[in-house]
């Protein structure tokens, strides 16, 4: 089978427009504390701040107001998420928290040492699934102007966090360390729509705390175990001793009750992407490729009913689910790294295809972006339906085995039949909405689907390829006159 390079393919197909999301801070970007924001900076001389042994008041906000995400550090290893602000403390505001499968397992995780909260110095992404926070403290009574302790926190999307205290003091420090925890076990959809749940009451559980609600249970365990655990305040407490230059660490693990650790799809031998390296005069090309593949691996999900089929999710952090057009475009762009993602995406979407009589037969349903009862679902199926035969045809060119192509060919034929039926005797494919506009990008998708779909039909002895090419040529001829606008 001839191999074609993506660079030689016409670029008349563009990824579909996704929801407007706030930009996410990229890994490696240092963050300085902001003076216009309460980030736990010391409020008393000597760096003294509020202790976390008292539950902080809920931050007031307008009901239904969408929480901001433009400054958040978002760690992704689906189905796990960890969303943090720059200071590293989880305060229960907005989207902050640790999530699994769309449920917030931990919304509050505030560290204090000897009653003081660390002063934020740096926050950055270190991988797609991890963020690192650095802060400083002045804890010794006779400390000078320089901090005598550095606090490092590394938070992962799988629900683990490691906190390390490093002393630069010249004498031994004996200090209480407190971590205040809390959660509402709310669904991400409710939180994203500005309606989080009330904070739940904790109970002491093993080496940590546990929360329960009608929808589930979550627990946090600590290693080493705390000296004291106070359920009423949601507080874990240690009494530590640090010699000069010494360090102390604790690891927190957040889990759904009864669930094991998150097993991500794209790690190690399970990755659908073949090893690749970038050869370029640009020094950053290799790092860019590596980072891009890692980001894609973090967004991989399995079809729950067919675990061998994988696809890419879209919509982080607001929702992390299957958006057909986005998944098909992304799978097409990764064809140089293998066809496993493409075939998994196609199989998953083929199982959702609408069948039976009616004008919608053959459609690949769009993303049902259901955020619970608060935000209505939206469904845009046209682009996904047009992209399905395109991806199948191009995956075949990139070496998808013939038996797998033949398995998916009936679904591609139904997509093309929907296109023929919807266009009818006309020249263009109209918008899915009644009396909707004729979008130029939709015509680009339809033109490519007709041409590559015709190649598929011809290759497997199906009829209809000639008619698809004739219609594509008619549309191409008429398009400049109908869509071109002169200044």
Question: Where are the model-predicted features located?
Answer:
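Amphipathic alpha-helical scaffolding segments
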Residues: 127, 180-183, 257, 347-352, ...
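Terminal accessory carbohydrate-recognition/targeting modules of carbohydrate-active enzymes
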Residues: 1-293, 309-310, 316-326, 332-340, ...
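Catalytic cores of carbohydrate-active enzymes
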Residues: 426-432, 436-439, 445-487
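The core hydrophobic/aromatic register in alpha-helical repeat solenoids, strongest
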Residues: 209, 392-395, 450-453, 457
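Glycine- and aromatic-rich loop/turn segments at beta-sheet edges
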Residues: 300-317, 355-374, 420-435, 481-487
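An acidic intrinsically disordered interaction segment
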Residues: 283-302, 346-359, 480
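Aromatic-rich carbohydrate-recognition surfaces in CAZymes
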Residues: 320-426, 440-443, 447
